[in-house]
Amino acid sequence: MQDTMSIANQLWQARLNGDVLDDLPSPASIEAAYELQALINQVSGQEIIGYKIGATSKEIQQLLNVDSPFYGPLYKDYSNPIDAAVPVHTKHTPRVEAEFVVVLKEALTADNSASISRQQVEQLSLIHI
C-alpha cells in the first residue's frame, strides 16, 4: 500500500500533467481526505488565496459518492481574470460549474457557532458571481 505523501505527489503531478489516475485508493474518511489535501498543498508549493466549496447539490454528491459538501483551496497560479483563456487538458471530459466568490474585508474568526452575525455579513466587501 502506498503512503499518503506518495499519493499526494502522484495527485499533484497528475494535476500538472492533466493525467487521470484510476488506481489510487480513496481516503477512508473525510478527515483522511483533508489530511491528504494538506499534503498536496505542501507538495505543490502553491500560494493559497482562498477556499471553495464543492458538491453543494445532492446530485453532485451522489455522482462523487460523498454525503456532504466539502472545501478545497484556491491556488494563486490557477486563478484567472474573467476574460482569460483557460487551457483544458485533452485527457479530460471538461465540465462547467458556476463558482461564487466572496471577498471579505477581514478574516472571520473561527468559533463553534453555526450562525453568522449581522456584523459578519456586513464585513463582506464584494460578492462576485
PLM regions: where:
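Extended, compositionally biased flexible segments
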Residues: 2-116
